[in-house]
Amino acid sequence: MQITRVGSQPSAKGPSDWFTGTVRIDPLFDRPEPSRVGGATVTFEPGARTAWHTHPLGQTLIVTAGCGWVQRQGGPVEEIRPGDVVWFAPGEKHWHGASPATVLTHIAIQERLDGQAVDWMEHVTDEEYQG
């Protein structure tokens, strides 16, 4: 058994290669092999968002605070709120982030395949973000 106490792991700033705007990542768990699951609480300041990306085994988002937007490639920008759970299928190109006026916090859970949990791509343009 392992208990990870809240606040026991340092926060990290979301790197500008992967995010637009101010993003804080608070690691929750990252299990060693043979497990492959990891998770973090991610907080986006208003207007902040991920770059386009995919996950080899998919990703689950659990919205805990604020208001945000998500979009899969070719689909509409959709609003998410606390209590919403979003599933992105393996290989589904997508982005997620805060709405223009509201902070968003969600828990992100994904699994690694051959040591990789995410494939980062190009930044979401302002036009794409605005839908």
Model-found features: residue ranges?
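Conserved short histidine dyad/triad with adjacent acidic residue
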Residues: R24-P27, G38-H55, P90
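Short beta-strand His + acidic residue motifs that chelate non-heme Fe in jelly-roll/DSBH
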Residues: T50-W52, V70-Q71, F88, K93-P100
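Short acidic-glycine-tyrosine-enriched beta hairpin
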Residues: G74-G91
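Short, conserved beta-strand element in jelly-roll/cupin
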Residues: T41-E45, T54-V70, I109-R112
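Conserved strand-loop elements at the edges of beta-sheets that form or border functional pockets
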Residues: D30, T54, I62, I80-P82, ...
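A short hydrophobic beta-strand segment most commonly corresponding to one strand
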Residues: T60, W87, A101-M121
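A short, N-terminal "cap"/entry segment at the start of jelly-roll beta-barrel domains
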Residues: M1-V37, A117-G131
